[in-house]
């Protein structure tokens, strides 16, 4: 992901809102107004142009993960036994496969699960499927 942790060359939120549908592959049927909200959430408009609103060091962590050998994560997941667990998956996610989500559900039949249609990784958390999963998760907390 060439854009992670970098300030865009775009100057305004309007430009970013127009560009986001082309950068955020896997997100379908997103209204222009939502792309504008996302642009305003992720970038601050300055006289020099847009600046990211998150730590740019995220880029190094993100890139190093691609170069590293994948660790076996199932023991970590299994260690959550007895704890409330929820998964909100974008149906078009290129990072969390349907097979992995199915295995998570097999291992934890009690896991709260939502799959958000027309969304990639990471889905918006204020859509009905996401909100229902978040509410269900919060209800299970002690």
Label each region the model flagged.
Residues 116-131:
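Catalytic histidine-centered segment of alpha/beta-hydrolase-like enzymes
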Residues 1-15:
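Flexible "cap/lid" loop of the alpha/beta hydrolase fold
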Residues 10, 94-95, 125:
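A short, basic/aromatic alpha-helical/loop segment that forms part
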Residues 43-106, 115:
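Conserved serine/cysteine hydrolase catalytic core
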Residues 26-41:
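Acidic/histidine metal-binding catalytic segments
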Residues 13-21, 36:
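An amphipathic alpha-helix signature
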Residues 110-112:
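Conserved beta-strand segments of alpha/beta enzyme cores
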Residues 133-141:
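C-terminal alpha-helix
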């Amino acid at each position: 992901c060439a854009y992670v942790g970098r300030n865009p060359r775009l100057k305004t939120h309007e430009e970013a809102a127009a560009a986001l549908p082309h950068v955020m592959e896997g997100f379908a049927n997103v209204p222009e107004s939502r792309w504008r909200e996302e642009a305003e959430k992720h970038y601050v408009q300055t006289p020099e142009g847009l600046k990211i609103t998150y730590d740019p060091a995220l880029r190094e962590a993100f890139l190093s993960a691609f170069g590293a050998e994948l660790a076996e994560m199932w023991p970590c997941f299994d260690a959550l036994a007895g704890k409330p667990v929820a998964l909100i998956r974008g149906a078009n996610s290129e990072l969390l496969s349907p097979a992995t989500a199915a295995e998570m559900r097999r291992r934890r039949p009690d896991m709260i699960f939502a799959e958000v249609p027309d969304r990639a990784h990471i889905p918006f958390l204020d859509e009905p499927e996401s909100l229902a999963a978040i509410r269900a998760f919060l209800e299970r907390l002690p």
